[in-house]
UniProtKB/Swiss-Prot annotation:
GO terms for molecular function: aspartic-type endopeptidase activity; endonuclease activity; nucleic acid binding; RNA-directed DNA polymerase activity; zinc ion binding. PANTHER family: GAG-POL-RELATED RETROTRANSPOSON, RNA-DIRECTED DNA POLYMERASE. Residues 205-252, 276-295, 738-896 are annotated as: Disordered. This is Retrovirus-related Pol polyprotein from transposon RE2. Residues 210-245, 276-291, 793-814, 828-841, 849-886 have a biased composition (Low complexity). Gene3D superfamilies: Ribonuclease H-like superfamily/Ribonuclease H.
């Protein structure tokens, strides 16, 4: 007879991978179309049965033998179903995928979607009914406003949908009908789930149910039966029907023992002692009817109780224990069920947990064990034992046997005891079954040892590894350190990338620390293996070290695991971009996340969060200063690699990678007190054999611990260490501020700096016997070996534990990279040339002086102590000078020396906890960039600046440049009639595009506002390139793949020679002591002078013309060099220069010539120019002002403002006198001015800026609110900009539009245009016309005239650039009348007042230099430059204009 498994045959025996790339993604509105498309596709592959269930799942096993065989049809069915499951998920949008998160098969997904979207539910009917009505009104010419549509939909909803109504009403702008429909569907699904939910409590230990109307045999033991995880016998109890059953058979006599009175011959239900429970039972059944799902168990006999005795129960569905110590992992029971015993009474369940049973070869796990205090036997559910551990149990009359289900090898054999099957436990195993024989620790101690993991992970480790726990009945107390340091946002969804072996996918990212570490580390880079989740961490001092670090990492892991790295996944940071050539040469794929989208690299981001949270918790728990974060983070990664994770089925990454469990017994609490054996380091026999140190981590190249001696800063690596995990040395030490360069303070700490971290990865273990290890531990001066084989006695420290790291766990392999040398650090000598930097007591010893016998290097930076500044500035002495020439002022030292800490320096000893004691600063707010944070830290005067050696060095560099350029001569003061211009210092911190600090800059500027025109200066001019010229040249360079170099001329204004006689006072802080009344007669221009920009331009222009450049007529700041077919473009914006060209040799020659003539700082490529971030990708160049936008938002406290979709609201319209006048318009004017500069890369802001600029003379609160809306729009789009696409066609066209009488104050029209060179937006404008016009045609006509003027100028510029257009420019206008006027020679009296515009355009059109073409209003891109638009229209036009967030990642086309 054929079995059921043989009857089910798959229709298609081939495994097919369905291509669903052409299937439209499922949304909440297109289910019917989507389902037909998907069903037809799978029907074509003959796989539709997997969707509708007609192809059922075959049985997992087949055969009638004792050991079943795997069913090949089941394996084939499961593989095909998973492929279909994945394909369907890929065809579902992200908003719909949560609805099918519980489905495990393709058929379940299909049925779930059908129930949600195919039923004629209230949400679907409501949507269709209202959308149909709205469409009918629109067809009748009476369209309903969107706000009214939303109101009509919401007012017809029942009370069950009130939460949705409240959420929509709380929004500033009403959502779309599609979004409302999605919310109604979600709410409807929740209501259906609440109405149809069935509560099914757990079942446990089904043994008996007392019922006088049944003859069921209650003895479930003693038969010779086989049980394994494949039997189909139901273990659930089925209640008997009410009433008596008719059974004519003679009942057999009962041969077992009663479970109540222990007398043989009758069962428990016929026991005489049972009658005393009858009344109680009947009363309980009448008030609380019995449910078949209630947990039940046998009533234990009154035999001697042994908590370690376990009985096998073939009818039980849950394990039960009455001894809490049997549970290694436990948690309170939250269900509402009790265990019912044979007499009908119930026993409460208080906890659930896990346990394990030992066998000859492996332990068997008992999961979901119920802790019932009042039961007297421990019961093992045979069903759960077999299914959990993949074993089978064979019962015999006097014994039983447990076998491995896969191999059939016997694991354990037991005998019956008192006619019960009792699990055999030897006396020596009775204690070790559930607890370790070593010393026990509390849950809190294990929580600290393991790096403060979550409660689930902690319990999993304790359970699976049988760790010794003291007082297991106590719950884990709340950990304040975890609450403080592990607060986080809601996680993102998991990635769909799968891997099948180690190193197939390596995820990497760089983390930046706001605090410079004690070893001068600012960053760390991680490499995470996707398959095992194993993590490697390398500390970095600069991001540029990532490439070399990856090369070392690649060699290390590929050699260790004998496999190659397949794919590196990272972000688009410059530190990873430079790896592309190396990766391609070695056959490694490089996947990158889209710019500013860290969620796509979620594995690395989550790993960062895990590492940082655990590291900060370790620091906080041990009161360790945050400057030690590399040590804490390395320990955190060390522990993370050894902690089980649900992603690996509660395996640890270490075990997944190396195939063996980690050793947890060597773990100690980070930062606790430790006492290493230091006898080999002593100079004489009377020195202490040990010192109190702080435990800082685990050695990865040796089987040893890292111990930091805080007073001396020495880091010992020792195997023989005693630990006191209750004491933390850092918590009892008073610290000053951090010794990092970024956090110096006037108060000096009383503790020295420490050793640097090794350059090896901090978390790389590997199995032993891989070759010789490099020893980096400190070694004694005379001893040949730092380790001693004699065990240290711990008798004198009863409260401490002596520990030695186990050698059973793999250690790190040797590292081929550089290792730290064991040489003492040589302290820098202080220079006494500067009076400010002199040590007040140079002969006194410094407490930071390194120990000459120290085997470890000291920190290269000692703690600075800056003396208290005086009220006057100490001036450097000037050397003697001749009468004809003034010698240069003495420069400030370029590298200020390190000042040693005075031994008697005051130390903060008060008890108040401050951030300064921990060496930290207040955390930055969201998007808080360095410029906004450092705005108040920039000195205002020279007196303030001279207190800081960094500003003092910057001032010295500026003075050196002035002296080297011979900018002035020191002369006696001129007659009183001659103006003496003052001067002052301007201090600025220069930042990179990512907000990181670049350098400190001090600029000496003249007070040019004191100059008088005609006397002190004649003409002024500043070389400023037009923004349109910049965009045109960059577009041409990108299209032709030319290199673009960025130059910065150092002290550019100092290059210009003055023709006027100008006198300036001596620089503050650098006054000649011998001639303090002298003044500086300027020879060269200096910043701040009215004529300085013009003098610099004349100097630069003269030089460029001599070397062959031609000055452009259209833009005087543009220079063109052409030699044969080679051409070079140079754009000048004051002292910033862009240069590009088609000949790299000529380009390099030009750059070298400029560097020889001027002091030029050259950048490798364009990246940050005039506050514009330029990101070049293979598809083109993206220009944005992200950092400038964020700085503006930070300055106005709008970083956390709620974003809006449009910069201006469509209603109400702004008027001149609406609202209340602002008392102080300064801030309003400043923000509008900033927005004007921001419009350089944001044409979507042009109209808003133009509109708000009209009220700068008298702004009101209405205008201020409109300005704040623009800032809110920027808060949601800080990284938007224009994209110059490669492969562009150089055709010129423009869109022109006008808003006729749009200003209700004076009824003047607003015209706007946007000009394109191919797909590149190169010029745009939004401004009011000069006067009132009488028709829309006239307004549009004047706008076309203005646009044609701009096109004519652009054509002239293109001609000078050597670019010839193949077709005349085209202007697109949406006004038919204006288009006809341009094309037809018509003129009459009504057009007299626009005759000039008419003749100008007519000549352009008739000569063929211009064409005017009509375009539909829906395609008029300039519409967004003349009036506020709705959200949908604005976003549509912004996208068409070319304002995007990031450049296309895979060659996407920018559609216009």
């Amino acid at each position: 007879m054929a079995t059921h498994a043989e009857e089910i045959v798959l229709v298609n025996t081939n495994i097919l991978n369905v291509n669903m790339s052409n299937v439209t993604k499922l949304t909440s509105t297109n289910y019917l179309m989507w389902s037909r498309q998907v069903h037809a596709l799978f029907d074509g592959y003959e796989l539709a049965g997997f969707l509708d269930g007609s192809t059922p799942m075959p049985p997992a096993t087949i055969g009638t033998d004792a050991v079943p065989r795997v069913n090949p049809d089941y394996t084939r069915w499961r593989r095909q179903d998973k492929l279909i499951y994945s394909a369907i998920l890929g065809a579902i949008s992200m908003s719909v995928q949560p609805a099918v998160s519980r489905a495990t098969t393709a058929a379940q997904i299909w049925e779930t979607l059908r129930k949600i979207y195919a039923n004629p539910s209230y949400g679907h009917v409501t949507q269709l009914r209202f959308i149909t009505r709205f469409d009918q009104l629109a067809l009748l010419g009476k369209p309903m406003d969107h706000d009214e549509q939303v109101e009509r939909v919401l007012e017809n909803l029942p009370d069950d949908y009130k939460p949705v109504i409240d959420q929509i009403a709380a929004k500033d702008t009403p959502p779309s009908l599609t979004e409302i429909h999605e919310r109604l569907i979600n709410r409807e699904s929740k209501l259906l789930a609440l109405n149809s939910a069935e509560v099914v409590p757990i079942t446990a230990n089904v043994v008996t149910h007392r019922n006088t109307n049944t003859n069921r045999n209650q003895n479930n033991r003693g038969d010779n039966r086989n049980y394994n995880n494949n039997n189909n016998r139901s273990n659930s109890w089925q209640p008997s029907s009410s009433g008596s059953r008719s059974d004519n058979r003679q009942p057999k006599p009962y041969l077992g023992r009663c479970q109540i009175c222990s007398v043989q011959g009758h069962s428990a239900k016929r026991c005489p002692q049972l009658h005393q429970f009858q009344s109680t039972t009947n009363q309980q059944q009448s008030t609380s009817p019995f449910t078949p799902w209630q947990p039940r168990a046998n009533l234990a006999v009154n035999s001697p109780y042994n908590a370690n005795n376990w009985l096998l129960d073939s009818g039980a569905t849950h394990h039960i224990t009455s001894d809490f110590n049997n549970l290694s992992f436990h948690q309170p029971y939250t269900g509402g069920d009790d265990v019912m015993i044979a007499d009908g009474s119930t026993i409460p369940i208080t906890h659930t947990g896990s346990a394990s049973l030992p066998t000859s070869s492996r332990s068997l796990d008992l999961n979901k064990v119920l802790y019932v205090p009042n039961i007297h036997k421990n019961l093992i559910s045979v069903y759960r034992l077999c299914n959990t551990n993949r074993v089978s149990v064979e019962f015999f009359p006097a014994s039983f046997q447990v076998k491995d289900l896969n191999t059939g090898v016997p694991l354990l054999q037991g005998k019956t005891k008192d006619e019960l099957y009792e699990w055999p436990i030897a006396s020596s195993q009775a204690v070790s079954m559930f607890a370790s024989p070593c010393s026990k620790a509390t849950h809190s101690s294990w929580h600290s040892r393991l790096g403060h993991p979550s409660l689930a992970i902690l319990n999993s480790v304790i359970s699976n590894h049988s760790l010794p726990v003291l007082n297991p009945s106590h719950k884990l107390l709340s950990c304040s350190d975890c609450f403080i340091n592990k607060s986080h946002k809601v996680p993102f969804s998991n990635s769909t990338i799968t891997s099948s072996k180690p190193l197939e996918y390596i995820y990497s990212d760089v983390w930046s620390s706001p605090i410079l570490s004690i070893d001068n580390y600012r960053y760390y880079v991680i490499f995470v293996d996707h398959f095992t989740r194993y993590t490697w961490l390398y500390p970095l001092k600069q991001k540029s070290q990532v490439k070399d670090t990856f090369i070392i990492f690649k060699s290390l892991v590929e050699n260790r695991f004998q496999t190659r790295i397949g794919t590196l996944y990272s972000d688009n940071g410059g530190e990873f971009v430079v790896l592309r050539d190396y990766l391609s040469q070695h056959g490694i794929s490089h996947f990158t996340s889209p710019p500013h989208t860290p969620e796509h690299n979620g594995l690395s981001e989550r790993k960062h969060r895990h590492i940082v949270e655990m590291g900060l918790t370790l620091l906080s728990h041990a009161s360790v200063p945050k400057t030690y974060w590399p040590y804490a983070f390395s320990v955190a990664v060390y522990l993370i690699n050894r902690l089980p994770t649900p992603l690996l089925q509660l395996q640890s990454p270490f075990q997944k990678l190396f195939g063996q469990p980690p050793n947890y017994e060597k773990l100690k609490v980070f930062g606790c007190a430790c006492y290493p054996w230091l006898r080999p380091y002593n100079r004489h026999k009377l020195e202490d054999k040990s010192k109190q140190c702080a435990f800082m981590g685990y050695s990865l190249t040796q089987s040893a611990y890292l111990c930091l001696h805080i007073p001396t800063g020495r880091l010992y690596t020792s195997r023989h260490v005693q630990f006191d995990e209750r004491c933390f040395p850092f918590s009892t030490t008073n610290f000053g501020v951090s010794t990092s360069q970024e956090q110096r303070s006037d108060s000096a700490p009383n503790w020295p700096s420490h050793t640097t971290l090794p350059t090896t990865p901090l978390v790389l273990p590997a199995p032993p016997c891989l070759g010789p290890h490099l020893d980096t531990s400190p070694r004694p001066p005379s001893s040949p070996s730092p380790l001693c084989t004699t065990q240290v006695s711990s008798s004198n420290l009863p409260s401490s534990s002596i520990s030695s790291p186990s050698s059973s766990e793999p250690t790190a392999p040797s590292h081929n990279g550089p290792q730290p040398t064991a040489q003492p650090h040589q302290t820098q000598n202080s220079n006494s040339n500067s009076p400010i930097l002199n040590n007040p007591n140079p002969n006194s010893p410094s407490p930071n002086s390194p120990n000459q016998n120290s085997p470890l290097p000291q920190s290269p930076i000692s703690s600075p102590h800056i003396p208290t500044p005086s009220t006057s500035i100490s001036e450097p002495n000037s050397p003697s000078s001749s009468s004809t020439s003034t010698p240069p002022l003495p420069p400030v030292l370029p590298a200020p020396p390190i000042i040693q800490v005075n031994a008697q320096a005051p130390v903060n000893t008060h008890s108040m906890a401050t951030r300064a004691k921990d060496g930290i600063r207040k955390p930055n707010q969201k998007y808080s960039y360095a410029t906004s944070l450092a705005a108040n830290s920039e000195p205002r005067t020279a007196i303030q600046a001279m207190k800081d050696d960094r500003w003092r060095q910057a001032m010295g560099s500026e003075i050196n440049a002035q002296i080297g350029n011979h900018t002035w001569d020191l002369v006696p003061p001129p007659p009183p009639s001659v103006t003496i211009v003052g001067c002052r210092w301007i201090f600025t911190k220069k930042f990179n595009s990512d907000g990181s600090l670049n350098r400190y800059k001090a600029r000496l500027v003249a007070k040019g506002y004191n100059q008088r025109p005609g006397l002190d200066y004649a003409e002024t001019f500043s070389p400023v390139i037009k923004s349109t010229s910049i965009r045109i040249v960059l577009g041409v360079a990108v299209d032709r793949s030319w290199p673009i170099r960025q130059l910065d001329v150092n002290n550019a204004f100092l290059q210009g020679t003055l023709t006027d006689e100008v006198y300036m006072s001596q620089p503050p802080g650098f006054v000649d002591k011998d001639r303090p009344d002298y003044v500086c007669r300027l020879r060269k221009a200096i910043y701040g002078l009215k004529q300085a920009p013009r003098a610099w331009y004349v100097e630069l222009r003269t030089y460029l013309l001599t070397v062959g450049f031609v000055n452009s007529i259209s833009d005087t700041s543009l220079f063109v060099l052409q030699r044969g077919r080679s051409i070079i473009y140079m754009l000048v914006y004051v002292d910033d220069i862009l240069i590009t060209g088609n000949d790299t040799v000529l380009l390099k020659h030009t750059l070298d010539a400029l560097s020889q003539r001027f002091s030029v700082k050259e950048h490798e490529d364009l990246h940050y120019f005039l506050g514009i971030e330029a990101k070049r990708v293979p598809q083109g160049l993206h220009l944005s002002q992200r950092r400038y936008t964020l700085d503006l938002l930070a300055r106005t406290n709008m970083l956390t403002a709620k974003p809006v979709a449009t910069p201006m609201a469509t209603s109400p319209k702004l008027t001149l006198h609406s609202g209340t006048k602002l008392p102080d318009p300064t801030e309003y004017r400043g923000i509008v001015g900033s927005l004007q500069y921001l419009a350089f890369t944001r044409p979507d802001l042009s109209y808003a800026v133009n509109r708000l600029s009209q009220y700068m003379h008298m702004p009101t609160d209405d205008h201020w609110n409109a300005l704040k809306r623009v800032l809110r729009y920027l808060a949601g789009t800080p990284d938007h900009g224009i994209f110059l696409k490669k492969g562009n066609t150089l055709s010129l066209h423009a869109y022109s539009d006008a808003d006729w009488a749009g200003d209700t104050d004076d009824y003047v029209s607003t015209n706007g245009y946007i000009v394109y060179l191919g797909h590149h937006p190169i010029s745009w404008s939004s401004k009011k016309q000069k006067g009132v016009v009488r028709s829309s045609t006239e307004a549009e006509y004047r706008s076309v005239a203005n646009t044609s003027s701009e096109l004519q100028w652009i054509c002239s510029l293109l001609t000078e650039l050597g670019i010839q257009l193949s077709h005349p420019p085209v202007i697109y206008c949406d006004n038919v009348g204006a288009t006809y006027l341009c094309a037809n020679p018509v003129f009459h009296s009504r057009m007299k007042h626009i005759a000039l515009d008419y003749h100008f355009i007519r000549n352009q059109v008739q000569s063929g230099a211009l064409r005017v073409v009509h375009v539909s209003t829906h395609d008029q891109l300039a519409d967004t430059l003349t009036k506020p638009l709705s959200r949908v229209a604005f976003q549509n036009f912004s996208r068409k204009i070319g304002v995007i967030k990031v450049p296309p990642s895979c060659g996407g086309v920018l559609r216009i």
